[in-house]
A protein has these predicted regions:
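Pentatricopeptide repeat
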Residues: 11-16, 20, 88-93, 97, ...
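Low-complexity/repetitive intrinsically disordered segments
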Residues: 1-12, 311-312
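Helix-start/N-cap signature of alpha-helical segments
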Residues: 7, 11, 60-63, 84, ...
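Fungal C-terminal region signature
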Residues: 221, 263, 273, 290, ...
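Intrinsically disordered terminal tails
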Residues: 253, 279, 298-305, 309-312
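Short coil/turn connectors between adjacent alpha-helices in alpha-solenoid helical repeat scaffolds
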Residues: 23-66, 99-111, 159-171, 206-228, ...
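Hydrophobic packing position at a conserved site in alpha-helical tandem repeat units
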Residues: 1-4, 22, 45-48, 52, ...
């Protein structure tokens, strides 16, 4: 080109990058770090369609919604044949993560809705609302690339954990069982329920745990959560020992969260279990030198809090 410029042809990476910018903006705004240079970054991209970058962004939810708008545009244009750019799981995960990190009240519901759509269209395709018509790219063969992966499951479990609605924990259990069944059926490495996935489930339980001293119902809830967390830890250990696959091995994050779950029970028996877990992981770290088992400052803080319940 005489002016040194080159033609710009957007592809799926372009749109995923745009969504990632807005997802990061959602996290930044949610953490109270202000607007930053988000608008400058977006508006500096002159080749980006105007409908994807105009308007003000003032809250974390605004930014997350902007990422979702881009995804919806890519999806609609591909369905109708206006574009040959097909959305993929990576792009959906970016949007899921942005919504999760904006911590809006409806984030769990919104994330679950998108996740369920991913599952549905990846096995059924996208039927036209008018039964007598078809989308140009609505066939299931065109949508296999949006099937949820292990990252999708992890994001959804952690986001559902933000909700205070009744029955939320059963949803997390169902998701964990679902990904394990899908992996067993397909042996797809993208669906492997590794330690990171287990940690996401545990974190969801922790967000819905907690006990108020003298309040029997909350104490029972904390105990149930701690019991479920310990079951997940045991499952990880069993898989690791049976397969020798280190990707299943509980790490210090796993154990620290398990200790934390017991510390929330405000019960001497729970304190003893938490201390046992800490002593075991500490000995294992000293014996093996495995950096994944090295207690962190958070580990010491949690076990100290757990121990304080024993003496109060």
């Amino acid at each position: 080109m005489k002016d040194g410029s080159a033609p710009f042809n957007a592809d799926v990476v372009t749109y995923n990058t745009l969504m990632k910018v807005w997802g990061r903006a959602a996290q930044t705004l949610a953490e109270g770090r202000g607007r930053g240079d988000v608008n400058e970054v977006i508006h500096a991209m002159d080749d980006v369609p105007e409908e994807l970058n105009h308007g003000g962004v003032y809250t974390a939810k605004d930014a997350a919604d902007r990422a979702l708008t881009i995804l919806n545009t890519v999806e609609k244009n591909y369905l109708t044949g206006a574009s040959d750019i097909a959305p993929n799981t990576f792009g959906y995960n970016i949007v899921l993560d942005g919504i999760a990190k904006c911590h809006a009240k409806d984030a769990p519901e919104q994330v679950e809705k998108i996740f369920n759509r991913m599952k549905r269209v990846s096995v059924e395709g996208v039927p036209h609302p008018d039964e007598d018509e078809e989308y140009l790219n609505g066939d299931v063969s065109k949508w296999a690339a949006v099937r949820p992966d292990a990252i999708s499951y992890s994001i959804v479990m952690e986001t559902i954990g933000q909700s205070r609605e009744y029955g939320i924990m059963s949803k997390v259990e169902n998701l964990l069982e679902d990904i394990e069944a899908e992996y067993e059926k397909t042996n797809d490495p993208e669906l492997k329920p590794v330690t990171r996935v287990a940690n996401s489930a545990i974190n969801a339980f922790l967000k819905n745990s907690g006990s108020i001293k003298g309040h029997k119902a909350s104490s029972n809830k904390a105990w149930l959560s701690a019991k479920k967390v310990h079951e997940i830890v045991n499952t990880c250990n069993r898989k690791w020992k049976e397969t020798g696959d280190a990707s299943y091995q509980p790490d210090i994050t796993t154990i620290t969260m398990a200790i934390d779950s017991y510390s929330r029970c405000n019960d001497i028996a729970a304190t003893e279990r938490g201390e046992f877990l800490f002593e075991k992981v500490y000995k294992d770290w000293k014996k093996t030198g495995d950096s994944k088992l090295k207690p962190s400052s958070r580990s010491f803080t949690v076990v100290s809090f757990c121990d304080s319940n024993y003496h109060t």
